């Protein structure tokens, strides 16, 4: 289990965010709380400092470009320069940054290469979920690459109606699953729309994962849901190494 106090997600700043931050001091100040910097070297400095504090790290690359080669090169450089600090770390990658819409085959190749690099460095990769319309394509990409890289994780937004079924399926497979409420808009026909219904869906999905063979990774700041996660872990005999939030 990685508590919110000892697990910090830092972002490698992409081009449009960098330009906006350069123009707007307010954006720059806000981003500094979450963004490691514009260059990989900035992320390395932040990672070194936080590692000395005993924190584990997660990285995302905020790129406006859908260039899979650029994503692979940035993440490869990050993992290489982290050296020993990469052990136990995580890199999250968006399907759009892999060029999934342009070429599913190439996206799979790049994701597989990134997984292989991460494995050599003792790190993990998690594939994020983006627009609901792309759900099937993202799941297909995840399943193809996970055949060779079983530690590849997937982010599931609990606001989508179909995610409960997906949680049962992936739970039976012992997958790494990051569970979040979901931030991309979707219609009432395919998603829960009220905050109350979203929260209930998140709890149901969390329960499914906690009672399964999955490695749940809960992404929430809601203290009530965090407390529930602790209760579910205790009830299901889960040790600190078997889930995180």
Predicted regions and their residues:
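Positively charged, amphipathic and often flexible ligand-engagement surfaces
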Residues: 1-245
């Amino acid at each position: 289990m990685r508590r919110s106090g000892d697990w910090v997600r830092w972002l490698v700043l992409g081009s449009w965010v960098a330009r906006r931050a350069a123009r707007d001091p307010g954006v720059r100040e806000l981003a500094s709380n979450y963004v490691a910097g514009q260059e990989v070297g900035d992320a390395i400095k932040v990672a070194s400092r936080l590692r000395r504090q005993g924190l584990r790290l997660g990285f995302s690359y905020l790129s406006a470009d859908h260039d899979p080669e650029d994503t692979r090169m940035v993440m490869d450089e990050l993992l290489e320069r982290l050296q020993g600090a990469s052990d136990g770390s995580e890199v999250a990658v968006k399907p759009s940054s892999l060029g999934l819409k342009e070429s599913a085959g190439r996206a799979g190749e790049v994701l597989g290469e990134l997984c292989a690099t991460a494995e050599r460095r003792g790190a993990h990769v998690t594939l994020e979920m983006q627009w609901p319309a792309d759900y099937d394509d993202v799941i297909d990409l995840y399943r193809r690459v996970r055949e060779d890289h079983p530690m590849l994780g997937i982010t599931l937004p609990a606001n989508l109606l179909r995610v409960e079924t997906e949680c049962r399926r992936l739970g039976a497979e012992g997958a790494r699953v990051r569970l979040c409420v979901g931030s991309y808009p979707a219609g009432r026909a395919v998603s829960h729309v009220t905050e109350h219904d979203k929260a209930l869906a998140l709890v149901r999905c969390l329960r499914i994962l906690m009672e399964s063979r999955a490695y749940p990774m809960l992404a929430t700041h809601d203290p009530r849901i965090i407390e529930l996660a602790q209760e579910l872990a205790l009830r299901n005999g889960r040790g600190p190494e078997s889930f995180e939030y």
